[in-house]
Amino acid sequence: METGRPNLFFVGLMGAGKTTVGRTVARRLHYPFFDSDHELEAHCGVRIPVIFEHEGEEGFRDREAAMIRELTGRSGIVLATGGGAVLRPENRELLKSRGTVVYLRASPHDLWLRTRHDRNRPLLQTEDPKGKLEALYGARDPLYREVADFIIETGKPSVAQLANMVLMQLEMAGFRIDTAAASDQPANDTHS
């Protein structure tokens, strides 16, 4: 693993805001931003639903674990993980040991409102997507809590407010933040 600047990893269910908030925090910190799902799609050359269709969820999780291993081995990044990244113990261990983990927590109802029209979420292509989100929340919430250094509730705050909450929690936890760099000035974001 590279050494140097600390890493910041976002976990939470699909639709919790990991990519949106993560990208905003990365810009404020002047860190490169990565989304493990986007990186996996770029690496494979196909969208995640295609991976699910051809390899099933287990095949996707194998590829996801390899991507998590690679990305968490870097230094000074902000990473938004896929919602199911915490399902594998090895992923949880890598996240916990290689960075600070933020759990963006949202209620199943809020998640459903945010994801109900999104056809790129294979696990929600079901008769009862809201029920599926409730089941996923019940199964995964304890795993997110297990790896999280802190939890941010995403219900009402705006993206900017959530980013500020994350930065304040990081600072209170001793995360090395260059306060001049953590201003609202945009940074170059070369990663999707």
Swiss-Prot record:
Record: residues binding Mg(2+): T19
GO molecular function annotations of the record: ATP binding; magnesium ion binding; shikimate kinase activity
Annotated cofactor note: Binds 1 Mg(2+) ion per subunit.
EC number annotated for this UniProt entry: 2.7.1.71
Gene3D superfamilies in the cross-refs: P-loop containing nucleotide triphosphate hydrolases (3.40.50.300)
Subcellular location: Cytoplasm
Catalytic activity: shikimate + ATP = 3-phosphoshikimate + ADP + H(+)
InterPro entries recorded: P-loop_NTPase, Shikimate/glucono_kinase, Shikimate_kinase/TSH1, Shikimate_kinase_CS
Cofactor(s) listed in the protein's UniProt record: Mg(2+)
Domain of life: Bacteria
Entries under Pfam families matching the protein: SKI (PF01202)
Pathway linked to the protein: Metabolic intermediate biosynthesis; chorismate biosynthesis; chorismate from D-erythrose 4-phosphate and phosphoenolpyruvate: step 5/7
UniProt entry keywords in alphabetical sequence: Amino-acid biosynthesis, Aromatic amino acid biosynthesis, ATP-binding, Cytoplasm, Kinase, Magnesium, Metal-binding, Nucleotide-binding, Transferase
SUPFAM superfamilies recorded: P-loop containing nucleoside triphosphate hydrolases
GO biological process assignments: amino acid biosynthetic process; aromatic amino acid family biosynthetic process; chorismate biosynthetic process
Residues that hold substrate according to the record: D37, R61, G83, R140
Keyword NAD annotated: no
Ligand binding (ATP): G15, A16, G17, K18, T19, T20, R121
GO cellular component: cytosol
Assembly with partners or alone: Monomer.
Family the UniProt entry places it in: Belongs to the shikimate kinase family.
UniProt function note: Catalyzes the specific phosphorylation of the 3-hydroxyl group of shikimic acid using ATP as a cosubstrate.
Protein name stated in the entry: Shikimate kinase
Gene name in the database record: aroK
